[in-house]
Amino acid sequence: MSKKQLVKTDGHNQLDQPNTKALQLKKKQFNSGVRVTSEISFLREVIAHHPGIETERVIDNQTFGSAMYLERAQKEHQLFIKILRQHGTKVHYLQDLLLEALSAADPNVRQDFIKNFLLESGIKSVSTFEACLNFFRSLDSLVDVIKVMFGGIKVSDVPPITPQRFADIHVSNSPFLIKPLSFSLYPHKFFNTLGTGVALFVTNDSELKRHSLVYEYIMRFHPRFDGVKLYTNRDFKNCLINSSDIIQISNEILLIGISHDTDVLGIESLARNLLSDHTNPIKQIIAINIHKFGAKTNLNKLIAMVDVDKFIIARKVLQATEIFELTATAQRDVDGLAQIKFKPLKFNFGEIIEAIIDKQPRFVIIGGGDEVAERKELLDCGMGVLNLSPGEIVVFDRNHYTNNLLNELGLIIHKIPASELSRGPSGPLEMVCSLWRE
């Protein structure tokens, strides 16, 4: 790859479109399609999740600092949504989309969804499975079913289960038969728009995979996504790909981190389906090996684009030297799949960014370069900023070192209080999934 020109390729999509079916809701009720041209384009539509009881039912997950105080978390989140709406961004709530999708589908689909949800909840006892299934069937409405799915089912919610076999004995000290969907606050972790298509992300974590079932059914049965192309799905085998490792830095280019959550097979699988779709504007993937930076490090913890030439970075990302370019070809591999051309790039990280944006980048080191401040603001999701438009961002107010530096660069900064929201693993960026940017 030269520093001034990036290769463009065309081809054919290798992954079938989602198995959508005839829907009862009229399509004119919904906008159709998705489109994201870059991380910083004007934000038109998003998916968000209003914090519910699941946010204070975090009792055994090491990813959260602690359970959130629900009332305060809801107020903080409402301020966040208010900023989006004042900007002109349409907000679709996750539970509303799921309700619309299941309402549009056949009754059999709803029953299958409940059963699949229970199967992915890790229930090993037939009696417990039946008790939970009957509990769902006893609820008055689909709205109640969805609320219970997100909030979890406690042992005390169902009638006492009489053990019929040894596997029916409840030996766990957890108060839950089905754990809450505690990560629902972060739609970006599970579902993301890439150009004019979408990706469902692949993980080995059983809890996160259970969350992604919600997005699979929305994708398959909601009129909004009828005909939208799916580039990765939950059925991908023997590979990993995480939304936190993907940054759409321009209309044609994705940056992807090779990490403990995103492996080379996952990147190749995404590349094969995405880059060979000639209707999608994305034509290249730049893969950066970030393994050496730690097991819990994803690319969006190392770099955040905040304007056409401005980036927040963690100092260590400048040490990244193993970088690859992936593009589509017209050839086929021995397995008959579209062949992906790849080559190592002999540029350092800063030179790669300069080549992509075609100008000298301006890097702001998180925390202002102070080692203690950098660690503190990385932990407080200072890198997880959400772009509303070029040079206009939403941030947590507590990251004042970085916020002040961005303010000095002339950025428009919307600060939200985050005494509770910052207890979670992510910032404003992952609290929404962008559906449309322009």
From Swiss-Prot:
KW Transport (keyword) present: no
Alphabetized UniProt keyword annotations: Hydrolase
The keyword Hydrolase appears for this protein: yes
InterPro entries the UniProt entry points to: Arg_deiminase (IPR003876)
GO molecular function, one term: arginine deiminase activity
Pfam families: ADI
One of the protein's GO biological processes: arginine deiminase pathway
Family per record: Belongs to the arginine deiminase family.
Name of the protein: Arginine deiminase-like protein
Organism: Mycoplasma pneumoniae (strain ATCC 29342 / M129 / Subtype 1) (Mycoplasmoides pneumoniae)
